[in-house]
Amino acid sequence: MASFSYNDDSVVVIIGSGAGGGTLANELCQKGIKVVVLEAGARQSPQSFVNDEWKSFGQLAWLDPRTTSGTWRVAKDFSGLPAWICKTVGGSTTHWAGASLRFQEHEFRVKTVYGDIKGANLLDWPVTLSELEPYYAKAEYKMGVTRTNGIPGLPGNNNFKVMYAGAKKLGYKEVHTGNMAINSQPRDGRGRCMQLGFCFQGCKSGAKWSTLYTEIPKAEATGNLDLRPEAHVTRIEHNDRGMVSGVVYFDKDGKEQRQSARVVCVAGNSIETPRLLLLSASNMFKDGLANSSGQVGRNYMRHMTGSVYAAFKNPVHMYRGTTMAGIIRDEAAHNPKRGFAGGYEMETLSLGLAFMPAFLDPGAWGADYAWWMDHYTNLAGMWLVGEDMPRETNRITLNTNVKDKWG
């Protein structure tokens, strides 16, 4: 791996090493461009991943304290941890389930198709699905997405078989094991999915696509990547012309460092990216970097979800196989006759015992709750995932009264 000088202002600095940062780093390195990646978390590996939900959460998740306010359910229910994002090399590609779906045509024209929705800040995209299709195809090929490019789908586990039987009985037609960035056959030097059942905890077989062991090692092999784990960025600096000139961060030993740069790419997820841009305010950019619109941090969106679990007569063992093992897409289209904008998809969701209390009946106790836990092997579960509307009031801001350990 390369090691560039702190004063080398010819490098591109990328903040974050996940789906965006890790992939961009490899693309630039392959073209001979020197890159420094600053990642706040530590570097793990398939060998160091832990097949234990609670221990893995401590290993991969971003656990730095958050503060929340307002009446949004997210602020009330998850005040200290409003989003499950990862602080590790590879970012949330270590944790994600691997579902890799394309936007639908109408989702590029939500302002036109949905019309005015009270409280929603809607815009049409400046590009169309047809314009993006070549890039979708390129990404799907690179990631080995199943059911694209002639790549077969993954096998369905018992949880999928339960959902499939019910879906077909109800008349649904588009029911399958999904478009997943998980190898269904050996590919790109990695083996096929071993159906271990701990997709959220990091893939120990390496079958699930993650920049941790795909893009980043390929970038390192070029000699153009300087990856610095446990580097917590605190601000981006600029010169008197308003052009970025460097990044200030704390290294793994807690020492403040400054890396010069000709270009800075911020790829730190939906919370850390706006926080860093706002933290980098200066006399020239009083409202933060790239924020002349005042929109940085606004329009924070999440999943709209609902879940259901049921106990069956015979064992299901839903925890075996991929966490998201199947999907129903018949309801994904926009249908205004239903009385709401956008669509939704139904997916299997196999959760381990450590997470079941939050999904079954939060706060439950006693014999009834114990019965569900005793019958865990007989449970099958699914959830639906819908579209959250962008609202300017749902936003990421800086807390001026509370500081983190970096000040």
List each model region and its residues.
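Beta1/beta-strand and adjacent pyrophosphate-binding region of the FAD-binding site
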Residues: F4-G20
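Short, hydrophobic/aliphatic alpha-helical segments
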Residues: N7-D8, T68-W84, K255-Q257, A261, ...
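Conserved beta-strand->loop/alpha-helix structural units within folded catalytic cores of enzymes
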Residues: G16-G18, G22-E27, V36-L38
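Aromatic-residue-lined binding/catalytic grooves and analogous aromatic/hydrophobic interfacial grooves
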Residues: G22, G242, M373
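Glycine-rich loop(s) and the adjacent beta-strand/alpha-helix scaffold that form part
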Residues: E27-Q30, K34, G41-E53, T222, ...
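Redox-cofactor-proximal catalytic regions of oxidoreductases
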Residues: S56-P152, K313, V385-K405
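Conserved redox-cofactor binding core of oxidoreductases
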Residues: V74-K76, T112-V233
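FAD cofactor-binding and catalytic pocket of flavoenzymes
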Residues: D77-W84, V89-S92, W125-P126, S293-G407
